Amino acid sequence: MASLRFSVTFPALFSLLLSLWVVDACTSRKLISNNEQEGQNISHLFKDGEFEDPTMYMFFKISDLKLGTKLPIYFNKNDLRKVPPLLTRQEADLIPFSESNLDFLLNHFSISKDSPQGEAMKETLQRCDFKAIEGEYKFCGTSLESMLDLAKKTIASNADLKVMTTKVMVPDQNRISYALHNYTFAEVPKELDGIKVLGCHRMPYPYVVYYCHGHKSGTKVFEVNLMSDDGIQLVVGPAVCHMDTSMWNADHVAFKVLKIEPRSAPVCHFFPLDNIVWVSK
């Protein structure tokens, strides 16, 4: 299995993020509201054409986890001009990070409250301020140092903390296509037994912020190999299945994408290329 896994140190994590943003392409997360559409004309690639936002195509059912299953999945190339700055812990700790400080923060970053950027900042701060639901652990990392320390504190009482990411592998980098494609499980997905997992998603904000969350139980982690329909792109990396969705918001988009009754069944998903997945025994 070719997905990236190694014991984590700060220099290794810094190198990893550089590879995600510079060497490899990653999922573009513009500083916009989650409600703003991307407006790309790719509806002809959808299963049924009912979703306009291609980033919704990361969810799947646990019954799909088998050799030969074909799924539409979307990856998008990152525009380096839109990657926000990465702050050190010392720099990040000087800036308040809470919705209660929103007015100060908007003024500090010269962002209008009613702009898409202002709405996106508010949504990020709200998500980071929300209390974890029962059985969940969560935090927001505003620097690499804080994310690494909090990940160790949350799921690894010892040094046995590893990181996984999604990688796109092609024989020629010029042939990478970051669009909605059909991918097929090229190998039997491998379940990683007995591990704790913490998924970290980059959030829209004026500097790099990762929202990290996981569940104390009821989560299955898999390593997967996905081959594009044209046989050119091999995607390797982690996939997670949340076995108990009974506490989820009934309006969660995953239920709509998968066409299942809210809170009635497990929900699985792949990870965008700029996400980080921490795992620990």
Curated annotation (Swiss-Prot):
Keywords of the record: Signal, Vacuole
An annotated GO cellular component: protein storage vacuole
Domain BURP: 59-281
Origin superkingdom: Eukaryota
Pfam families attached to this UniProt entry: BURP
Tagged with keyword Signal: yes
Signal peptide bounds: 1-25
Protein name, entry field: BURP domain-containing protein BNM2C
Species whose genome carries this gene: Brassica napus (Rape)
